[in-house]
């Protein structure tokens, strides 16, 4: 007989914004095993993989998925959760804002912290559609889900860390460990940079629920303060607003078409200084769209954020997903829209940007 533990429906109750969550991020603290509330577990796992709405006969989840293939199965290992028996559970979210845990009998998993979220990669769901490139999409999706969980843990005042399992546990390569906060290990002091940020219009939890992939944008230009906000909350600082796996591997470029106060062109973004360096003059959006298989939203967006890496490491792809989740939630928080674009000719994108790096993602950004 199945043992199902219903979780509280997800409701946006916290007042913190993504700007506040990344300032006091979960990964900055020592992770201490201490009893946490079931409500906290419920919110954190929802922010990773919960059903936020239904469309086209399926659930839309808190983390985006290439072609809505949803290759992840999510498990929770409970160690010290008030109101939940210790053990391994399968996470289920079959309807908007509703979710539950199903006990997995006869399985024992070593974990740290108060509870751990495991992401199993059912790769054939995505590679069956996209071939070998699907493996990159899966790692990016794990990054989105992991960062969603860590952001919610930050808002709840808990500690959390992403961990790579070596060796992997079957098809589980990455996990997120959540616990109470111990000593603060790192300080985050975001740089001032090129412009003051714009305030968020939504709380973090509201943004999690309302996040969608947006492909149609108005012709209204973006503002510098909006651009500053997205970059500050997504990738800025000597200590960035997400946890690295040993080192930072992702670089950031902007293809600007229509931002008030910023000439069209390609800009290299410096996370450490929060500054922009113009490396190509003139609007390249049409060429970038051609490199992205003719996706018109790339051509029409006032801004395209392009994430690249000089590394061959698969961990760079996971990191791109973490940055990407920040970009999605930052844009949503500002009343803007974006979509993760992973289908493009790598060499052509690099040529448009004039960089000798491997492109990982394109994020067109605009007003819905």
Identify the residue ranges that each predicted region occupies:
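N-terminal amphipathic, basic helical "cap/leader" segment at the start of enzyme domains
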Residues: 1-113, 159-160, 168-170, 182-301
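A glycine-rich helix N-cap at a beta->alpha junction
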Residues: 168-189, 353-368
């Amino acid at each position: 007989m199945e043992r199902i533990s219903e979780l509280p429906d997800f409701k946006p109750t916290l007042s913190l914004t993504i700007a506040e969550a990344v300032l006091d991020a979960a990964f900055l603290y020592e992770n201490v095993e201490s009893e946490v509330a079931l409500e906290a577990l419920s919110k954190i796992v929802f922010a990773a993989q919960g059903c936020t709405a239904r469309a086209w006969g399926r659930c839309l989840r808190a983390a985006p998925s290439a072609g809505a293939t949803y290759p992840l199965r999510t498990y929770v290992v409970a160690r010290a959760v008030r109101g939940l028996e210790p053990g391994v559970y399968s996470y289920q979210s079959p309807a908007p804002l509703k979710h539950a845990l199903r006990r997995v009998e006869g399985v024992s998993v070593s974990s740290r912290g108060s509870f751990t979220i495991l992401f199993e990669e059912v790769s054939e769901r995505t590679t069956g559609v996209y071939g070998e490139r699907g493996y990159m999409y899966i790692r990016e999706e794990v990054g989105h889900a992991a960062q969603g969980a860590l952001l919610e843990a930050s808002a709840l005042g808990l500690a959390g860390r992403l961990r790579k399992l070596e060796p992997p546990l079957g098809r589980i390569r990455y996990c997120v460990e959540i616990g109470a906060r111990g000593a603060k290990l790192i300080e985050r002091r975001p740089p001032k940079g090129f412009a003051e940020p714009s305030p968020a219009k939504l709380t973090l939890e509201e943004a999690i629920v309302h996040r969608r992939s947006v492909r149609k944008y108005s012709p209204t230009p973006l503002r510098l303060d909006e651009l500053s906000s997205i970059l500050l909350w997504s990738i800025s600082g000597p200590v960035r607003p997400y946890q690295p796996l040993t080192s930072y591997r992702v670089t950031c470029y902007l293809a600007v078409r229509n931002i008030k106060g910023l000439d069209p062109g390609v800009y290299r973004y410096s996370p450490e200084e929060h500054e922009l360096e113009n490396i190509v003059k003139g609007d390249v959006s049409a060429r970038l769209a051609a490199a992205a298989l003719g996706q018109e939203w790339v051509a029409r967006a006032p801004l395209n954020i392009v994430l690249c890496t000089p590394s061959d490491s698969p961990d760079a792809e996971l990191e791109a997903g973490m940055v990407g989740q920040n970009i999605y939630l930052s844009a949503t928080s500002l009343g803007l829209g974006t979509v993760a674009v992973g289908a493009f000719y790598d060499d052509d994108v690099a040529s448009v940007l004039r960089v000798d790096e491997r492109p990982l993602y394109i994020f067109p950004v605009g007003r819905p």
